[in-house]
Swiss-Prot record:
InterPro entries: 6-PGluconate_DH-like_C_sf, 6PGD_dom2, Mannitol_1_phos_5_DH, Mannitol_DH, Mannitol_DH_C, Mannitol_DH_CS, Mannitol_DH_N, NAD(P)-bd_dom_sf. GO terms for cellular component: cytosol. This is Mannitol-1-phosphate 5-dehydrogenase. Pfam families: Mannitol_dh (PF01232), Mannitol_dh_C (PF08125). The keyword Acetylation applies. NAD(+) binds at A3, L4, H5, F6, G7, A8, G9, N10, I11, G12, R13, G14. Its EC number is 1.1.1.17. PROSITE patterns: MANNITOL_DHGENASE.
Length: 382
């Protein structure tokens, strides 16, 4: 089996690329970073530090790389069995034209073996969004053929991959946590379902997408925002602060109550999942900076994201949400010289006041009780 993976960054190499290569799939990375491309093509291997209770070093081997903006990537799309991405939500639109060209070439060459495309991004139904961009870039006469022969498979991914400490000397070395979760929508595949260790198949993807968003992402963000306010440097330092831990755990329990109502998750199993995530935040090997995790607060405070979406669920089911409110107030305080969104957030609050600013960012009603609760909590943190 042959696969092409867009995005040779830390997540591409340390998570999806590693799972594909470990499964014995012939893997080619596509990227724009020439330093990384050259290193991959010179060595055809790289090291992954897998860190949990202990640290182990795995070697990923037998890999190649091509530029994601050249002709080689188009040729590969015409030949491979699987295309995956880990490029970041914004970049999906940029890689769509190359994918479209490759699909046209595949059709012209008469290659009717099924091709499945899986976007492995931190977003809801990312592959469906990628499909929209690809379809827009396709000529009309290729669209029906693509619908018939190409599967666009949505997925949920979860693995913490911090910036590597050794990035200065080896552009390929990467550190990842032991935990990894890659859940894909089995109803969207064309042809036989793949058997890739570490890839889980489900016919109820949205339950798992929201479980991850409402637990890992919600908890991670709140840990970062409250940690930064308290002067902590890393996620580990922040979650070991008992006051912060109580709010983070409480927020994950509040969002968890929504998931249990909505999807019928088992309460005891979900409590164990929360404990596992708290343990991941404590990982001493992951020097995960609160500023990195907190960045892009406008996106993280938007209606469909990790803070407001679970809050809306608590309103829908008349459930408590006081810890989620604390997290939202913490996010409103996030300041970073390196993050344009943090600066925009500060300017918006200075200009309009916290009430109108939060309403604008989150689409919540400015006169609602929850906005009033969040503003009270925000002011109490000053």
């Amino acid at each position: 089996m042959k696969a092409l993976h867009f995005g040779a960054g830390n997540i591409g190499r340390g998570f999806i690329g590693k799972l594909l290569a470990d499964a014995g799939i012939q893997l080619t990375f596509a990227d724009v970073n020439q330093v990384v491309l050259d290193a991959l093509n010179a060595r055809h291997s790289y090291q992954v530090h897998v860190v949990g209770e202990t640290e182990q070093v795995d070697t990923v081997s037998g890999v190649n790389a091509v530029s994601s903006i050249g002709d080689d990537v188009v040729d590969l799309i015409a030949q491979v069995d699987l295309v995956t991405t880990a490029v970041g939500p914004v970049v999906l639109e940029r890689i769509a034209p190359a994918i479209a060209k490759g699909l046209v070439k595949r059709k012209e060459q008469g290659n009717e073996s099924p091709l499945n495309i899986i976007a492995c991004e931190n977003m809801v139904r990312g592959t469906t969004q990628l499909k929209g961009h690809v379809m827009n870039a396709l000529p009309e006469d290729a669209k029906a053929w693509v619908e018939e022969h190409v599967g666009f498979v949505d997925s949920a991914v979860d693995r913490i991959v911090p910036p590597s400490a050794s990035a200065t000397n080896d552009p390929l070395e990467v550190t990842v946590e032991t935990f990894s979760e890659w859940i894909v929508d089995k109803t969207q595949f064309k042809g036989a379902l793949p058997n890739i260790p570490g890839m889980e198949l489900t016919d109820n993807l949205m339950a798992f997408v929201e479980r991850k968003l409402f637990t890992l992402n919600t908890g991670h963000a709140i840990t970062a925002y409250l940690g930064k306010l308290a002067g902590h440097q890393t996620i580990r330092d922040a979650i070991l602060d008992e006051k912060i831990r109580a709010v983070v755990k409480g927020a994950m329990e509040e969002s968890g109550a929504v998931l249990i109502k909505r999807y019928g998750f088992d309460a005891d199993k979900h409590a164990a999942y929360i404990q596992k995530i708290l343990g991941r935040f404590e990982n001493p090997y992951l020097k995960d900076d609160v500023e990195r995790v907190g960045r892009q607060p406008l996106r993280k405070l938007s209606a469909g994201d990790r803070l407001i979406k679970p809050l809306l669920g608590t309103l829908e089911y008349s459930l408590p949400h006081k810890n989620l409110i604390q997290g939202i107030a913490g996010a409103m305080h996030f300041r970073s010289e390196d993050d344009p969104q943090a600066q925009e957030l500060a300017a918006l609050i200075a200009d309009k006041g916290p009430q109108a600013a939060l309403a604008q960012i989150s689409d919540l009603d400015a006169n609602s009780e929850v906005v009033s609760e969040a503003v009270t909590a925000y002011k109490a943190m000053q």
